[in-house]
């Protein structure tokens, strides 16, 4: 193991320039042409289904369209091929080193043939399963440039960790996924090097290579990671020190732009080195005698150095332009901070105590969920079944209001009682805080459900001052038709493509599906956009510097505190920690 680590580090140092040149080109092509090809197919999928975007509202009709399914298959086929091709080229670079790459038309034809052979039949599903399996760990493993921005949506993990059983399930699954990732760590390198292998065979062989104590060979690479992290840290520290020396705490435009560009370059190079080193180390685990081609002549090396210089200038120019635009922007102004079900750290979700805590913390709105009881009363609750908070298997939509109002609810050491929508609104008026009401239809509602809600809003005299949203698009659009004064919104937990409705006033979109392009489109159409559920310090800081209109959070106090810190425009060290999602270090 030590011998392999030394060999990998020596190889990286000896061929660093050619590796940087070739792998930078590969990453650039994958994240531009490859990503564009995938987005183009995605657009074809949406057009073929006659919808502007896919959400949880239309996913059934989306997946029952034969043409859509056919194009979706092509999309996944192209995705898996691009991942396979990327790793094939990475291995080719490691084997060729300074020698000339034999990447011509024949090479792509050959790789396409071997790819199709390796995923034929059910092996295609095995490949997709493998890619999905790696998503929780793309930051820690050798992953494709096309997959590095993927992660488990927070609305899935966030809901799970709110209960003890959920935490056990979440961390248990994480541990199982981590174990399988370690056991299948050799699968993709095996698939691209052993060209006659089917992918499931590669999975099986990887499982064999990591049996027993052999799994510790993979963990031994941690020493190389520490070396790479140390180098990145030293270079970053030098950049921080130089920027602080030149600029102090003023953050002038040009110094800030250069600082952002330098940090991006260091992190980009570090990621490339990590990917190459880890892949090279894995190859030595089963293919130590890999063929290596003859080195090129000295004059060719000079040409490569010129090409490397040119490439760095191009990438550096793009990087500088991007960061110049970023540096010219500023934090969001007048950002709405919306307490998610009140403030759950200070009380049971959707309780009066939680509402009061959100108001004291300075929330712009407090979000709550309401469900209609069997006898037509709106009850404040996120779940139709009350077992999670009451311990009793009672369903709101099948119960009389008098039988459930006042039930004791418990969560995270807090206690309260189930209350009506009317009592909740009365308390909000007393506290001087507005509400964001989320309608939670269960399927048991009467035909006049939306009219009942509109009438209730008018009765409480809050129809024009509160925000109302629902994940059921038909419900919220009907509410808007019944009373145009109500500020209505669509709750979106997952979305691909454009917004599916222009009839609402705002969108509340989950963090996983948010991007700045969607925000700009919403604003161009006169709509607002809110993001949920933003809880970590890094996510809060990131969204405070986007064009979103507001964040829905469990930690209202944290958002207000971080707002003040960003407004103070502190040191370059703080700036660096925010850029690299390492702000938590300051709290150690």
Describe the function of each predicted region.
Residues 340, 358, 369, 404, ...:
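Conserved, mostly hydrophobic/aromatic
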Residues 1-337:
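Hydrophobic alpha-helical membrane segments
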Residues 341, 368-370, 437-439, 470, ...:
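A cross-domain feature marking catalytic cores of carbohydrate-active enzymes
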Residues 219-220, 490-492, 497-588:
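C-terminal active-site rim and adjoining tail of enzyme catalytic domains
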Residues 372, 385, 441-443, 474-475, ...:
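Active-site-proximal loop/turn and secondary-structure-junction residues that shape catalytic pockets
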Residues 382-486, 525, 579-587:
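Metal-dependent phosphodiesterase/phospholipase catalytic core, i.e.
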Residues 334-338, 365, 432-436, 465-467, ...:
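Structural preference for beta-strand elements that scaffold enzyme active sites
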